[in-house]
Every structure is written in structure tokens, then in C-alpha cells.
Design a protein with these regions (language model features):
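Extracellular ligand-binding/catalytic regions of CAZymes and related secreted enzymes
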Residues: 27-36, 63, 214-217, 226-281
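Helical hinge/lid and interdomain linker segments adjacent to catalytic or ligand-binding clefts
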Residues: 30-31, 38-42, 49-128, 132-134
Length: 281
């Protein structure tokens, strides 16, 4: 009887160890919960329907990735719109990416501009949409600025200097080969504004060009900013609500967010855990 017990005990222990190993292995195989990316959308100012676009962008972008978008909105429709979120010393703390969609062309205070840019210089990625390219301008911004000059800082962050646009007409968009555009189909917008580009800074990579009549220029691009090589992605497309709500536009912008945060594969697909949890409508 003792011999049988001695034989059964090791077998039972072996079975228990196997069960423990299997349970541990199964637990290890379960994917860890991935926290959503946190984005801050700064939006408001002159010349656009930002009251509607803030909600269009939040809904459309959150639908396309494991992403939470907080909104810092100013109802001020002037070119001197200011934003309460910028009043905090560490205003970007806790966010993985800042989406700039403000149109504050006549905010020229260098202290304010420095506070806005400091998080990006420290490594917080940036995504810039349409009117952001025409914000924080001073001096003779109609001419190419000099690198390092007081009126160059915002343009250096953007990676490109734009000063104006023509009348609204459809823009034919053609993509370049890049992870942020992989798999995206060329398309034509409704009536939109084609921004001019009077200076493209070294290191800026063209992602898309837009053609409107006989004029063709860069409409989406990316670069690395400052000593930290912060990833910054931008597009000048996005004036009208219909364009902002267009699936092709939202697909482009979400690529910029994922690329800038390092959550985009070379095939243009989100990194594991950052794909949308439900099918895009």
C-alpha cells in the first residue's frame, strides 16, 4: 500500500506542475491590455467652423485607432484666439501627441509661442492640421524666414513655411511612398484651399502633393524636430467640414497620429493594440 502511495504521489505532483505550467503559459499568452493613446486637440480661432470640426475630428479619429482625444477649444473666431490649456506650465503633460488645429495668426508674443513649442522640443509628438500652418506669425513672414530668427520658430516646428492660399477648388492628391501613406488611395477633394509653400526646411519629407489647376505643391509632410528628433506630421488640407468628415481625410490624419507616436508599422497598419476595436463605419 505504501509503495502504491509513493508511486501515486509523484504522478500527482507532476500533474499539478503540468497544470500550473499550462495555466501560467495560457496567462502569458493573453495580450496585455494596451492603454489608448492620449491626444490633445487644440482647436479654434479664425476663419473655420471649429465648433463643428472639433467633434467631427474627435469622433472620426477615435473610431480609427485605440485613441482618446481630449479637446481644448476656443470659441474666439478672431486671429488672436488664445487657449486655456496653454496657460499651464506643463500643459502637454500626460499626452502622447498634440494635434494643433488652431488658427491664431496674430498671436506674436514670443513667450506664448515658446510655451507652446517647449513640449515638442522636449519630445512630445505633434500633428498639425490646415490653419495651424498660418498661426503664430510675426515680422515679414511673407518672405522666407531665416533659420533661428524670432519669427522662424513656429515654421521650423512645422517643417515648412506657408503664407497664403488661393480660392477654393478641388485638389487632386497624390501620395508618396511612406509608412504613413502605405495603402492609401489617391483622391480628389471637394472645393478646398491649396496652401502655398514658400520654404521647405531641410529634413522635411514629402508625403503627398496636391494639384489644383496648374498649381501643384506639398500638402502633407513629416520631419523630426529639434535635438530630441521629435516626430512632427502635418497637412494643409482640411478647411471645410465636408473634407474634415471625409473618410479619406480621417484615414490620412490617423496615419499621422500613429506615425508620430511610433505606433505605425512599415505596412501602414497600427502597431499591436492600437488598431480600432470596432469596424470603421
Amino acid at each position: 500500500m505504501k509503495a502504491k502511495l509513493l508511486l501515486i504521489l509523484p504522478i500527482a505532483l507532476l500533474g499539478l506542475a503540468g497544470a500550473t505550467f499550462m495555466a501560467t503559459g495560457q496567462d502569458a499568452a493573453k495580450p496585455a491590455t494596451v492603454k489608448p493613446l492620449r491626444a490633445l486637440l487644440v482647436i479654434g480661432g479664425c476663419c473655420h467652423d471649429y465648433a463643428a470640426q472639433k467633434d467631427i475630428l474627435k469622433a472620426g479619429l477615435e473610431e480609427r485607432a485605440n485613441l482618446t482625444v481630449d479637446i481644448c477649444y476656443s470659441p474666439d473666431k478672431s486671429t488672436k484666439a488664445t487657449f486655456t490649456c496653454y496657460e499651464k506650465e506643463n500643459w502637454a503633460e500626460g499626452y502622447d501627441v498634440i494635434i494643433h488645429n488652431e488658427c491664431s495668426a496674430d498671436i506674436t508674443d514670443p513667450t506664448v509661442i515658446k510655451r507652446i513649442l517647449d513640449p515638442h522640443l522636449s519630445g512630445t509628438p505633434g500633428v498639425n492640421l490646415h490653419g495651424a500652418m498660418h498661426s503664430y506669425r510675426s515680422g515679414n513672414y511673407g518672405k522666407p524666414v531665416t533659420a533661428g530668427a524670432g519669427n522662424a520658430h513656429w515654421f521650423e516646428y512645422i517643417g515648412l513655411q506657408s503664407t497664403s492660399h488661393g480660392k477654393q477648388l478641388p485638389i487632386s492628391i497624390t501620395y508618396s511612398a511612406h509608412a504613413a501613406t502605405a495603402g492609401l488611395e489617391n483622391w480628389t477633394t471637394i472645393n478646398e484651399e491649396l496652401y502655398n509653400n514658400i520654404q521647405i526646411f531641410p529634413g522635411t519629407e514629402t508625403l503627398a502633393k496636391g494639384k489644383q489647376g496648374d498649381s501643384e505643391t506639398v500638402v502633407a509632410w513629416a520631419h523630426e524636430y529639434g535635438d530630441k528628433k521629435t516626430k512632427v506630421w502635418s497637412t494643409t488640407i482640411g478647411h471645410n467640414n465636408e473634407t474634415t468628415a471625409d473618410a479619406k481625410y480621417l484615414d490620412l490624419v490617423i496615419r499621422g497620429i500613429l506615425w508620430s507616436t511610433g505606433k505605425l508599422g512599415a505596412d501602414g497598419k497600427p502597431a499591436p493594440g492600437y488598431a480600432p476595436t470596432a469596424a470603421v463605419k
